[in-house]
Every structure is written in C-alpha cells, then in structure tokens.
Amino acid sequence: MWLLAGQKAPDHSTIARFRTGFLADACEDLFYQMVRRLEQMDELSKETVFIDGTKLEACANKYTFVWKKSVGKWEEKMFLKIQEAVALLNREYLQSFSVSKETRTHDIQKICCFIEQVCEEQHTVFVHGRGKRKSRNQKYLELFRRFLERQTVYDWHTASFQGRNNYCKTDPDATFMHMKDDHMRNAQLKPGYNVQIGVDSENIVAADIFQDRNDVWTLIPFLETIEKKVGFRYPSVTADSGYESEEAYTYLREQKQKPYIKPQTYEKWKKRSFKQDISKRENMGYDEITDTYICHAGKELKPLFIKKQKSKSGYESEVTVYECEDCTGCPHKEKCTRAKGNKRLYISKSFLEKRQESYENILS
C-alpha cells in the first residue's frame, strides 16, 4: 500500500511491458555505470580481460525447432511441383509464365492475379463440398494460392534463421544448442543463448548475449562491445581454446592487443599417443629453407599449391597444401594417412605463427 499510495495494483501485463520495454536497457545502463565507477576507484587493473562463456536455456518449447536444411528440402520439392503446374497452366491458357528461385514469391503472386482476373471475366462460380465439380479456373486458383501460402511460410522461416542453422518457433531469437548441464547424457539440443562475460580483478566488467553456439564467432564482437561500453581497450586478452582462430589472432594483432589464448591442441600435445603419431605435422621434420616437411619414412612433403578459405564471417585465410613425393609401397602409410594417394598436409602458416606467439605469451 505504501508503494502504490492507495492506487490500483498493476496487472501482470503491465509489469511484463515494463520489464521488456524499459527494465532491460535501464539495467544494462546501471551495470556499466557501476563498471565505470569501479574504474574511477582504481578497482580495475585495466591490463587484461578474462573472457569465458556459458549456455543459458531459453524459456521456450523444446520441440518447436525449425531446421534450415529441412526448410530448404521442402522448398525445393515444392518448387519442382510449381514448375510442373506452371507448364500445364501455360499450355491450357496459352501464356508464358515462369517462376525463378530468386523471385518465386512475386512470380506466384502474378499468376494468382492472372487467374483471379480470368475468373472474374468468365464469371466463374466457386463450389465447395462433396458432389460438386470444381471448374478449371477454381482448381488452378486454389492450387497456386496454396503454393503462395506455403512459399510465404518458407520465406518467413528463411528470414528467421538470420544466418543460423535452426531457430525456435516460440522464441525466434533462441538457437538450439548443447547445454553444458546434460543430466540425461543424451546430448539433447535445447533452445538457448550463448552468454559471454569479461572479468577484470574479480569484477565482471562486461556481459553480452549471442545466438551463435560457437565461442569462436563471439570473441571479436564481444571485444568491440567491451571497448564501447567500458570506454577503453584492454592491452591483453585471456581466453580458453574455444576462442582460438586465425581471424581472432589477426584482429587482436590489428588492435595491438596481446593474446593469451590457449591452443586447441594444447592438451593433446602432452599425451604420449600424440607424440608417437607419425601422421601429425608436429612430429615431422621441417626445412625452412626449402619449405618442406620430412615424414617418418624420410620422404619430403613439398608445397603443391595455395588455396584460399573463407569463414562464415567473411575472413579469408591462405592454406598451403603439401604433398608427399611418393607414398607407394611405404610400410608406414597405414599409420600416416587414410588417403588412397599420397599424404597431404593442409597448413595455414599465418595461423601457426600467430598461435606460437600466443603460446609463448602464456609460457612467459
């Protein structure tokens, strides 16, 4: 009563509108005000930021997922049926309609408008129910309207994916991913979010939420968020192996930030089985002058060609392909490669150089 001052209590929808419309932005603003206050009090080292993430399950139905591959398959099957229907329509109505994949929705709408005009000119009577015979005009109009309705749904799905492979109907922003807490141990996919947190001197200085399940694609946008919200750039960044990529290393070098990112193969390097695996690049000799690797059998793997790979974010990396001179009759081939031909190595020199720099930073 004291809080309301005798006024009527707000209902649940009013509270929900306040939470979604005002509270989220206000809480974020208050949070970063506190971070800036900590900076003023010299409670932050401002030397390195420690980044880690976790998965949070969304408050959404677990069984309302839509998969991009499934939508593409259904859409392709319907497109073939549309092509057959358009060919029949052109033959019967002496028209030259066509439907392309790029403008299929617009093309189907044009066909529907044409049939509606024909129905109006010929005063077509629409019938429904058992025992009624539908006219040719009605059959074609209903058919293409169904196509248009389904295509509209597929377009909605495609727009909702936003570069993802799936989304949840009851929470379109959520992505289906493996949670860290898997009590049933069945690797069930659940709708959730990837939450990233930055820590400095035991204080959380930044937090952000992402749709991507992989930490690799969250590092760069999260660092940009930290710099924008906190107001300064950290000289060094510490993260686990889930954040390692050539793109991340390149970005940190451009921003003059020192990387302390654990290599993805760091734990494998310690194992005896890895050290005895003759197929691994790390266990081969290397001649810097000739740029060749020496395999367990003493044969050279020479650079064959350089290919370019582009990540989903658009980053382009160069990969050098090395091939052994001749693996025919080699007694170690079964342990060295599964390829029918000669042994090949795919190596990004830029990535290895940047990884070594980060590894040396950790050891220092």
Where are the language model's segments positioned?
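Anion-binding and metal-coordination hotspots
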Residues: 3-364
